[in-house]
Design a protein with these regions (language model features):
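Short aromatic-rich membrane-water interface segments that cap or initiate transmembrane helices
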Residues: 103-123, 174-183
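Alpha-helical transmembrane segments and their helix-start/interface "positive-inside/aromatic belt" motifs
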Residues: 56-75
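Cytosolic juxtamembrane amphipathic/interface segments immediately preceding
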Residues: 41, 45-62, 111, 115, ...
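Interfacial/capping segments of alpha-helical transmembrane domains
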Residues: 81-106
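Individual transmembrane alpha-helix segments
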Residues: 116-145
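Hydrophobic alpha-helical membrane-insertion segments
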Residues: 71-85, 141, 183
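Generic detector of multi-pass transmembrane helix bundles and their immediately adjacent loops
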Residues: 137-288
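Soluble N-terminal domains of membrane-associated systems
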Residues: 1-48
Length: 288
């Protein structure tokens, strides 16, 4: 509401006929500023507030950018499948000879994780966080770097999925991915959305200076990126200790589905009460 009112103020200022409205909106924003930016919790309470309130709120405010990341990833995956179907050499080029040979033998390459669970889990966490940060950072190039990262990640997933399905390992692959992928993939999409949000700030500043536009978009984007770090840590633990085990396939899918539902509820519902309280407070101020 605060950001929308600020945008309305910018529009009103650009129209000389809306001078009275501009003054009213400016006064309203001045009173609302303290409610929005003053008195935020700090320390441990601040961290708790961020993850229980602010992060899901920012996700809902910027969900279109995450949706764009999902679409780019899906397009990359579809392209990966299409190119693998039409050109077997492409499949070998992307995955490499050793991995193709392993898949052709109907062997999963993931079982080696079991022997080194703690080390593997740590490496997975580090890699996933690094990939998410790189995907986000690509947004500074007007979103081009983020676009490339999301498309290439999707393409790789598409090629792997096709290769495994071709060799009868589709169920093995998806049952491996399900437990941790339910958190890891949404985290990647949110990081991609953060990158696109950053790119929007660079390319489309509107009436703001490019510096101010990037600053505003960057704050929101960083919040999105920081919010997925714990999700990636949890996903790394699951990928190292649960996904590669011999746990029954239905249980793996159940774990994945349960985690995804919990994540969706968290992102869609958490922080709504405090947001409603702020809106009520702002409305009361504007009427006084």
């Amino acid at each position: 509401m605060y950001r929308q009112t600020a945008a309305d103020l910018s529009t009103a200022r650009a129209d000389p006929r809306s001078a009275t409205l501009a003054r009213y909106l400016n006064e309203l924003l001045g009173r609302a500023h303290n409610h929005v930016y003053i008195g935020a919790p700090t320390g441990a309470r601040g961290i708790l507030y961020f993850f229980t309130q602010r992060f899901p709120q920012v996700f809902r405010e910027t969900w279109r950018y995450t949706a764009a990341a999902v679409l780019v990833f899906a397009a990359g995956a579809a392209l990966g499948v299409l190119l693998s179907v039409t050109d077997p050499a492409f499949e070998r080029f992307i995955l490499g000879v050793d991995m193709i040979d392993t898949i052709d033998k109907r062997e999963m390459w993931t079982h080696s994780i079991v022997a080194v669970k703690p080390l593997a889990s740590s490496g997975i966490m580090t890699n996933n966080i690094a990939v998410s940060f790189a995907t986000f950072a690509g947004g500074i190039l007007g979103g081009v770097g983020t676009l490339y990262a999301m498309a290439m990640n999707g393409l790789l997933i598409g090629v792997v999925a096709f290769s495994c399905a071709r060799s009868g390992l589709g169920l093995s692959l998806f049952s491996f991915v399900a437990p941790h992928g339910s958190l890891e993939l949404p985290s990647l999409f949110i990081a991609g959305g953060a990158g696109f949000l950053l790119g929007r700030g660079v390319l489309f500043p509107g009436r703001l200076s490019r510096r101010d536009s990037l600053l505003i978009a960057g704050r929101q984007a960083v919040r999105l990126l920081l919010g997925v770090v714990p999700l990636l840590v949890i996903a790394g633990i699951i990928e190292g200790f649960v996904s590669p085990t011999d746990l029954a396939v239905p249980f793996k899918f159940l774990i994945g589905a349960s985690l995804f539902v919990l994540l969706a509820l968290y992102l869609l519902a958490a922080g709504r009460r405090s947001g409603a309280t702020l809106a009520t407070s702002l409305t009361t101020d504007s009427e006084s």
